[in-house]
């Protein structure tokens, strides 16, 4: 029996690092003024945050075009591979629509999944797909399972500053000023494919406790499936502090915790100093 060759394609919004040979990452584009960069290709996460901290106007990100997807599909299908595409939420970017348009000529060969998520929440859905592939599941079985299980992913984060929400027009200057003076730390989550405010906490310690309670509400982390911790900015200091404060959540996990830097797609809107966690509920 010939083993089905399966390739996963995702976008750079997934913040995947060190991908396997069977994963293709297509970059979104980031524009700072007149300068455009391919996310993770011509600009690293570190370089992105160095520029973000210096600029007064927020950069913009643009979708992966249908042509780029089509080229990737053609290459994979020509090599005898079945393709599973997992994209950032269609409510946050037109990338999923691009992937679907390009897939119209590849019926039965290319399957597109809207992760209804972003950053490390999207990443762990890809990683779960790889886990299922390694268990010998077919492409159709993997797609069916991922479509069913993607709603069980929780992605949430604690922001260090309101400055970037203000720059992006999501809150007023007055709210940002008062919030800064009171050391207000917003807690956000991805819900039904959109980023929502879960609540606010005063100070980092209360923010960490808020995040811990939200994870406990979801019955904790399912360590049998992929999960990931992430941070924005040039240092993981605040993430390490959060891990220390929430050590009871991770005590059943014997290996090194999976940690990722969060790139431009989320970093643009939340700024440096945010910490995030994505996991499957039990």
What residue ranges belong to the model's regions?
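Conserved beta-strand elements of the Class I
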Residues: 7-9, 84
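Class I S-adenosyl-L-methionine
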Residues: 36-105
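Mixed-charge interfacial surface used for oligomerization/domain docking
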Residues: 2-6, 13-35, 95-111, 117-127, ...
């Amino acid at each position: 029996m010939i083993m089905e060759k399966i390739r996963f394609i995702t976008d750079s919004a997934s913040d995947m690092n060190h991908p396997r040979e069977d994963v293709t990452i297509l970059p979104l584009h980031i524009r700072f003024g007149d300068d455009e960069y391919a996310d993770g290709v011509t600009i690293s996460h570190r370089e992105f945050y160095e520029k973000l901290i210096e600029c007064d106007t927020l950069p913009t990100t643009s979708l992966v075009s249908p042509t780029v997807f089509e080229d990737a599909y053609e290459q994979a299908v020509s090599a005898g591979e079945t393709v599973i595409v997992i994209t950032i939420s269609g409510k946050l970017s037109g990338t999923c629509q691009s992937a679907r348009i390009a897939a119209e000529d590849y019926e039965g060969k290319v399957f597109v999944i809207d992760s209804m998520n972003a950053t490390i929440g999207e990443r762990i859905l890809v990683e779960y797909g790889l886990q299922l592939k390694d268990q010998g599941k077919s492409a159709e079985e993997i797609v069916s399972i991922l479509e069913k299980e993607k709603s069980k992913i929780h992605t949430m984060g604690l922001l260090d500053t309101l400055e970037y929400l203000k720059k992006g027009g999501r809150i007023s200057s007055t709210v940002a000023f008062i919030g800064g003076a009171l050391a207000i730390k917003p807690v956000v989550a991805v819900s039904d494919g959109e980023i929502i405010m879960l609540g606010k906490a005063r100070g980092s310690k209360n923010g960490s406790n808020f995040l811990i309670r939200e994870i406990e509400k979801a019955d904790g982390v399912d360590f049998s499936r992929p999960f990931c911790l992430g941070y924005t900015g040039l240092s993981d200091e605040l993430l390490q502090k959060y891990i220390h404060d929430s050590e009871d959540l991770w005590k059943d996990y014997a290996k090194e915790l999976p940690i990722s830097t969060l790139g431009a797609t989320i970093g643009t809107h939340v700024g440096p100093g945010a910490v995030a966690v994505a996991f499957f509920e039990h």
